[in-house]
From Swiss-Prot:
Location of this chain's protein in the cell: Cytoplasm
Protein name, UniProt field: Endoribonuclease YbeY
UniProt gene name: ybeY
A Pfam match: YbeY
UniProt binding sites for Zn(2+): 113, 117, 123
Annotated EC: 3.1.-.-
Organism: Borrelia turicatae (strain 91E135)
SUPFAM superfamilies, per the entry: Metalloproteases ('zincins'), catalytic domain (SSF55486)
Primary site of residence: cytoplasm
Known function: Single strand-specific metallo-endoribonuclease involved in late-stage 70S ribosome quality control and in maturation of the 3' terminus of the 16S rRNA.
Recorded family membership: Belongs to the endoribonuclease YbeY family.
Length: 148
């Protein structure tokens, strides 16, 4: 059924750091003890993610990251992944300026965020001090962060 499979590609954007990004994702999966995964990550532009956001979430606007989980959700944290992450690099360019961080930091943060959603974490707010998922996200980022 599930194996160790990680696929990366781009839609409408240029990205030059595939090897570093691939190894970063593997380090996140390892840190979170995820041994079984079929994960595809698409780096895209705002137009691409907006179409998906409209189709699947009925929100006609771009967003930073979308996660699509193909495993049956149990309501508990699962350490298996079968899903897709869609991340808008164009959106992250703006948010990295807004938060005064490097683009690769924002990419890594959003990748971790999407992976946490795929294994069952949720959050109701963006409170980095009190939301368990966001606290874990920042811990994982501190432990696995790479410079591209």
């Amino acid at each position: 059924m599930i194996k160790e499979e990680l696929n990366l590609w781009a839609e409408g954007v240029e990205f030059k750091h595939w090897d570093a990004y691939y190894n970063f994702i593997l380090s996140v999966l390892d840190f979170l003890c995820i041994k079984e995964y079929e994960l595809s990550v698409i780096l895209c532009n705002n137009e691409y993610i907006q179409k998906l956001n409209s189709q699947f979430r009925q929100k006609s606007e771009p967003t930073d990251v979308l996660s699509f989980n193909y495993l049956e959700e149990s309501g508990q944290i699962d350490h298996k992944i079968q899903g897709d992450l869609i991340i808008s690099l164009e959106y992250l360019e703006f948010s990295s300026l807004e938060f005064n961080v490097e683009l690769y930091d924002e990419l890594q943060r959003n990748t971790i965020h999407g992976i946490l959603h795929l294994i069952g974490y949720t959050h109701k707010t963006n409170d980095f001090q009190n939301e368990e998922m966001l606290i874990i996200q920042e811990k994982v980022l501190r432990e696995t962060r790479r410079v591209f």
